[in-house]
Structure formats: structure tokens, C-alpha cells
């Protein structure tokens, strides 16, 4: 079979040096060299070529084809006069060289074959230079591609979907956490409210002194210059004389004293009599006891303010003599039965300094200190109540408002609700009993249409007459959240007042974030130490978990405003060390340069509800229906519900919703495409070319391994022969 002339570059005849030395003359050597160029001439010549058998007789054993010491290498002579070299018969180095040359001839990479086929050194140098330039340019581009990929950039796609949006969970709470009529039986709460009342009274006195403007008080045409005006003194109630501890300043000649109504006088010399109004808790004016005189007045008004003489022009028949008590100058008199007991203000206000069941350390633990700002005092009192009620959740539930007492009427999608089944109780430390609508995760609820008629409409009764003195506002706390999320009404809630219908229009947004390495969001589920068990992870819950861990570690107790960890007992309300430690670390965690930092990532999947709010007066005068559990006349019920009830509407403003999804801006596929594009542009290399290089490396490794194995076998045979 004629295979055609072989490529001359594929063959190189290299006689074994041992064979070369056996040639008898120079003519035989020249004939041997001519063998690689003209096989037919050599066969026809009369050259005295050594017989192979003659050579072989000098060896005691046969040689391996891979042996470096072999003196004869046999190559195939083709029919058309060419040589087809068997690479397995070449020496180790020649075999590697032969493989590299063959790779240069056959590779699909651009430029490399030009090196193997270069006719001279200059031609080869030019191609080496071109290959280096292209390789450098490719490396620069490859580095830029890799750096772009390592940035892990992402893009946010915004889509507006017109589909049925799931209705969220709605949490409803009374702004008053506990019923005043019930909670006062709690010993700790009774102490806290007593101290709170006293501190608020002192703060009011301080505010009144600070706002003194010398207002004149006029009675019967007689002007009295007031040294100070008490809080609420402009609102006249019913006055009566009352004993109080006082500080008197007699230098200004007015003989007027400053009352200290919450302090018990140490002696009779420190006691004075004041005109006291129970409605406003004002005690003014005050004078020493000896400056007041029991007498008879001719005119007293409905506020029990009297004058010794009747006004001019008053008929004798209209003059009514009333028992009264007047200060020495007779300018100020109060109606008073002489035999009646005089009220002691320190007993009326329940002087906190005289509490036999509360120690100094306990009072200090409450944290009121020298507070004079009423807003700050109320905030601290609310915190103290949370601490005092932290022991038993069952007790908190009983002292807070029950479900049917709060929720009177309800409808969803225009149909009545089942209050027992549709609302679930959640005990919140700040707001007491809260009730969640649409809590069941297995039941899908959605609005049929947009608008208030197809959302949640609920009427709530808060019973303002049973509010704690620390409850500053009357109304409802509402939180809109996903079913899987804890509501956090103290952080994310909205307040709705009584006497109004409050409308909350919603729009839903779904967020889908990328996890690492493109972002640092927390994937579905919760972290191992998340304190809100049974709820999905949220950033707020993470911060509270982090803070709770800090408090437990530093203070040895847990913050009662958050769920505890590992059964650790909450910090006690009257434990001074607990309260000071908690307050210290609460301030530290909020400092910019604080030593303790909480790192909380966003959840990868999150549903956000944006809300718009509007309100209108409710109920209207035309609403002549029986509201809730009111059994009075319609007008009376309307008035009662204006003060104690609120109407809420929660609905979708539109049935479409936004989907914000993050995606990788430059992923691995794009990187490989750009990488391959630059590789093909500058080097002409493809994936198949890379496979060629891989095969070359594998062949070279295989040759190296087999060579070392063969060498080891030869050494062993030689050692065995020598020993023999």
C-alpha cells in the first residue's frame, strides 16, 4: 500500500554511537548518512554495511526498545523511499524533543506552528516576538476580566406584577398595656405607681416655679400679687384648707410660704395652711398656721372662695353667712366648717419617703433620680412596669384586655370575621395583649378588590376609663407585617386615635437579595441563636438577639423587654445592680465608638408593606345604631364610643405589587466568555486547543514515569548480573 511521501521533518536518522564506532572506514559512514536522503541508492550501492547479526552477537541479552544503551535503532522503510520513525525506539531526550516538535507542527494554536516551520533563526525570532507581545496583551486583558469578576457587582431588577397579592398579618394592641383596676393589686406595680405619682408632683412644682411670671389674682376688686403661679392655677376647682410642710420667706413682707405637699413636716413650726384644689392638685396660697383665722364670711362662690364682706349693692336678704377661714390680712378666705378636720397633704399624696415597704435602694433602682421632665418620668415609669411584669406571662395576659373586650366588630372582604378563630393572642411586654389577624400560615387570604370595603375593617373598644396613669395617649397600636415575621409593635407600629376612623392603604414590595459572594444577606430560615422562635429572621430581631446576648453576658440577667435565652432570669425591677448594668450597656451599644457592635444582615427574601394614612371623625351623629356592646341610647353610645373606641380600615390601594430582585451583573459564564474571547483574539486558542496542551502534558508525564521505571529495571538487572 502506497502511503505517499512522508514529511521529511518527521524523520531524523541518528545512528547509535556504538554502532558508529564499528564502521570500518569513512566510506561506510558516508553511505550511512546518505541513507536518510536516498534509500534506493543506498540499497543499490556496494557499500560494505555491517551485518546486524554480527553486531548482535556481541550482546549477552536482548535490549529493550527504550534502553538508552542500545546500539541499533530500527526504523521502518516505506515503499516510496521515506522513513517512518517509531518514537518508542528513540532515546528519552530525543523522544521528548520529537513529541514537542510534533506538537508544534500539529497544534491548532496560532503562531506556534510558525515556530516549528521557521526556515531560519530570523524568521523564528520574529514569531517569538509576536507571540510574546500577544501573550502580554492577553495577560493584561485577562487580569482586567478577573478583577471585574471579583468585584461581584449586582443589578436590581424592578418588576410591577399585576397579580393577587396575599393579605398580610395585622397586629392590633391597646395603647394601655394593663387595666388600672386590676394591676394595682400587684405589689410591685403599686410601689412603682406611688413613686411615679410623687415624682410627677415634684416635677410639676419645679415647672411651676420655673415658669413664675408674677401673674396677679383678682377677687372682689382686691389685687393680690402672687409670688408664683402653680400648675393649673388658672382652672378654679373647689378649694379647701389643707396642712402642708412649707418653707416661708418673710423678708418680702408677703408672709407667703412655699408648700412641700409630699413631705411630712418635722414640727409644727414647719407646717402651714394652703388653699388646696383636689381637681388640679394645686395648693396656693400658703401661710403659716397662726396667720389663718376661723371667721364668718358673707359671700362664697361655687368654688368655695369667700369674702368677709358682701359686694356693694347686695341686698341684705341675699347675704348668707358662711363659716370660713381667712389669712390674717383678710384678703383670701376659704369656706370651711370650723369643726371639720383639715386635710394633711402629705397623707393625701402618699409621701414616698414614708413608704415602709420600699427601701432606699429600691427607689434608686427605679431610676427616677432627680428627674424633673414629665416626659422622661413617664418613659421611665413605663419601663419599670415592664420590668415588674416580667415574671409571669400568664399573669400579664390576665391583667391585660381580653380579646372580646377589645375587638367588638370585624369584617374582611365584606364578610363578618370569626373573632375567636381569626385573631391570635400575642403577649407583648410593652402593649400587653395584642391580637394578630390572618395569623394562620396554612390559610391564604387575599383581597378581592382594592379599597377599604375589601380589606379588614374592625371596631375596637379601649376603655379609656381603665387606663394606667403612665398611658399618655388613648388609642390603638397597629402593625402590618408578613405572617412569618414577628410584629414588633413597639418599633414598626402605627398609632390610631379613638373617635376617628383610621384608614391604612397598603402597597406590597417583595425583595430578593443575593447571598454571598455577591451580598451578605441571611438565607431562608433563622440563625441558630435567634430569640424569636417560630418566626422568620429579621434585622430587628437580630439586633435584639445580639443585645440580649450582651446583657446576659455582662449583667447575668436578661432584658425583660425581649425573650430570654437559655432560661436566664430577667433583670429584677428593684435590683439596683441589674438596672444600672442594663442602663450602662444600653447606652454603650448605641455609641458610635462603642466596643460592642452588632452585625446584622438583611434577609435574602423579604416582604415590605408601605402604608399611607388618613382619618375622619367617627362615629357620625347620623350613625344611630347600636355599637358594639353599648346598651344605651344611640346618642349616648355615640358619645361613649368617641371617647373609648376606634374604627380601623386596612386595605390594598392597588392589586399590583413590586418585585425587586437582585441578580449578578457579571457572572462566571460572562467571565469565561470574555476570557475565551481575549484568548482567541490574541492567541487563537480555543477550548480544544487547551485540550491539546493538556494531552501534551499528560504524554510528557507518562514518558517521564515510564523512563524512570525502565531505568530502575535495568539497574536491578545489572546489579543482579554483577552479583551472579
Swiss-Prot record:
Say which domain of life the source belongs to: Eukaryota
From its record, what is one biological process in GO terms?
A: detection of mechanical stimulus involved in sensory perception of touch
Decide whether keyword Manganese is in the record. no
- Record's Gene Ontology CC terms? cell body membrane; plasma membrane
PROSITE patterns given in the database record: ASC
Residue ranges in the Extracellular topological domain are: 147-684
Keyword match Transmembrane: yes
Task: Give me the glycosylation sites of this protein.
Answer: 294, 370, 463, 605, 624
Q: Which PANTHER family match?
A: AMILORIDE-SENSITIVE SODIUM CHANNEL-RELATED, DEGENERIN MEC-10
- Output this protein's name: Degenerin mec-10
